[in-house]
Amino acid sequence: YLGEKLLHEQDLNNFSWSIHAGADGSVSRRGWEVYSGSGNEDYFEPAIAITHNDGNPSTILYYVSSSSKAVDGGTETVINLRDDKYPVDVTLHYVAYPKENVIKTWSEIIHQEKKPVMFSTYASTMLYFNNSAYYLTEFSSDWAKEAQMSSQQLQFGKKVIDTKLGSRAAMHTHPFFEVGLDQPVSENQG
């Protein structure tokens, strides 16, 4: 929930927090993690995976605080998370631009362990959608064929949009995409 602060604790009952983790309902009901760490009971790929300096690969983040403030054209919400076993803090930033119907997000990860740690996964965000169909629009290019748009319905599995060109990413494989929920993207949605 990224809206205004609730006035009464019982207002939480108006939100649908629980889901079945397995299609057959074989796993206990629980909510989705906003930024899942490795080693918890989520079956999806974690947003963050750290091997701590003692060799433990688990990171379980807990809610610490949140705040919202007005920014140019929208609202920024900041969520602070912390591991209760290791000195790891994650700050999630969400900037919502209502006029454009766009959400910008990024994360900041800070560790204060006395020895180096190993990050094997770190994501800017972790988004969950619960729709019946998803459509991907991506861009590719070549010489004199810049930003060629193509779309496809996504099927089960992982789709990777990647480029190894660094600052030259715009030359061939753009790491940019749009996702359509239940329908292909269009000029006004996706």
Give the residues covered by each predicted segment.
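Polysaccharide-binding surfaces and accessory modules of carbohydrate-active proteins
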Residues: 1-190
